[in-house]
Amino acid sequence: MEVRRRAPLPPPPGRVQAGDALPLPIRHTNLIFSALFAASLAYLMRRWREKIRSSTPLHVVGLAEMLAIFGLVASLIYLLSFFGIAFVQSIVSSSDDEEEDFLVGPARGSSAAAAVAPPPPPSSPAQCSLLGSPHDDAARERMPEEDEEIVSSVVAGKVPSYVLETKLGDCRRAAGIRREAVRRITGRQIEGLPLDGFDYASILGQCCELPVGYVQLPVGIAGPLLLDGQRFYVPMATTEGCLVASTNRGCKAIAESGGAVSVVLRDGMTRAPVARLPTARRAAELKAFLEDSVNFNTLSMVFNRSSRFARLQGVQCAMAGRNLYMRFSCCTGDAMGMNMVSKGVQNVLDYLQDDFPDMDVISISGNFCSDKKPAAVNWIEGRGKSVVCEAVIKEDVVKKVLKTNVQSLVELNVIKNLAGSAVAGALGGFNAHASNIVTAIFIATGQDPAQNVESSHCITMLEAVNDGRDLHISVTMPSIEVGTVGGGTQLASQAACLDLLGVKGANRESPGSNARLLATVVAGGVLAGELSLLSALAAGQLVKSHMKYNRSSKDMSKVIS
């Protein structure tokens, strides 16, 4: 079956458009201009032959000839424009190879960013005709006949689902058709998954393939977080009750004690390809070449060609037999930077191939990076932004706001976060619940939630200061991987959350400063969350608070029934 583009729906009454001034159908317009072109051309050719026979100068033209020339030019422009656009569209939409590349090609940016969009308004003017209920016959009756035919072809396997956006030219319509096809194939109800109210064109080829809707997540605000003299209202997307409230209490304690201070220790994204050499000796020669400071300027020049923001910082190598793992680190501006550093690494590998033709590149990523996996190299060397955030909480705030005392908090941190994590053999997990805050902020601001693995590496330290009266608390997070451009940051909801923090988009005056500021806000949020949860544990309030905010008897009754 051939999937055809459907003409756009007519505008609602009262809305005047420019096309309303043309009462003729497009086929009649094409016929008129084609006839005008043929008639004008025939007339001018006849007059040209007559002038040649009578030796009349060709540049002498009458009114009729001028009108014919005007008609010829006007009709030619119209026909070239009309058929030229149709020709280009047919080329773009007819290549099956390009459709395959679109399906399996590498994702751009942070592909797993969640689409946290607001629910559609009750009286939305553009409601979906494909409601997705297996028992809703009325929905099927309202479905256009052409869409019904396409759905049937997708279900039968005649039309691949992944080509719908390309063939139809309407991302919203493609999502609706795919959704209905999935409903019929599975026989499952999905009407609870919203379809309308989301810009599907914004994720095409960038954030998510084969969309059928979007997931709604509530976004809460914790704050103000007083950090480095600025007040931030921190957006957190979560379904865990008590999390935002607890973080908010931590923010209050920090603000009433004068605020927190942060420092960015390092800023560099990494990528580590792995290459195999004929012998271990040969691999060692390549290792020495890469780590020799004499060659760094040349490698840096080759690497930095990938982007005007990419700046190679260093290369760290490790060997396993004759396999060489090369960990490149570079500054990536306000982008999280995985694509940027990967392009730079590819440039260097191509350059090295000239001097080391026996080098066999196994993979652009050899897991020495290390991305989306807990790894000692990230814990020790850092990846992304390495941040330390600290605050001194006054004694009266500990008692009045946190409902505990300094000594109990210090003792709990040692026994739980330090000794307990050591007993568990934790890697980067010397904290109470840093991952909770990191993930909630990541989802709200369009980061890659999977990078919560290394971004949540954190060690929380508590000490009694000022003769034991006040509490010094700090979090050290060596690998916060965030960006303010690319990936899910361009989605409307996530961009709004970034704008709330004042870090939306790239900073033109100081490239990279927006991403670094976002990393410090994440660390500040973790500081607040750690302070509040440890206080709840020390005071024995954890179970009570979760029973109040994280559990509902009404919801439980639904589950039981």
From Swiss-Prot:
The active site is at residues 240, 372, 448, 546. Its EC number is 1.1.1.34. Keywords: Endoplasmic reticulum, Glycoprotein, Isoprene biosynthesis, Membrane, NADP, Oxidoreductase, Transmembrane, Transmembrane helix. GO terms for molecular function: hydroxymethylglutaryl-CoA reductase (NADPH) activity. It comes from Oryza sativa subsp. japonica (Rice). It is an enzyme of class 1 (oxidoreductase). It is a multi-pass membrane protein. Residues 146-561 are annotated as: Catalytic. It catalyses: (R)-mevalonate + 2 NADP(+) + CoA = (3S)-3-hydroxy-3-methylglutaryl-CoA + 2 NADPH + 2 H(+). One of its GO terms (cellular component) is endoplasmic reticulum membrane. The gene is HMG3. Residues 113-146 are annotated as: Disordered. One of its GO terms (biological process) is coenzyme A metabolic process. Residues 90-145 are annotated as: Linker. Pathway: Metabolic intermediate biosynthesis; (R)-mevalonate biosynthesis; (R)-mevalonate from acetyl-CoA: step 3/3. It is found in: Endoplasmic reticulum membrane. It holds the Pfam family HMG-CoA_red. The chain crosses the membrane at residues 25-45, 69-89. SUPFAM superfamilies: NAD-binding domain of HMG-CoA reductase (SSF55035), Substrate-binding domain of HMG-CoA reductase (SSF56542). The keyword Membrane applies. This is 3-hydroxy-3-methylglutaryl-coenzyme A reductase 3. Catalyzes the synthesis of mevalonate. The specific precursor of all isoprenoid compounds present in plants. Belongs to the HMG-CoA reductase family. Glycans are attached at residues 304, 550. Residues 134-143 have a biased composition (Basic and acidic residues).
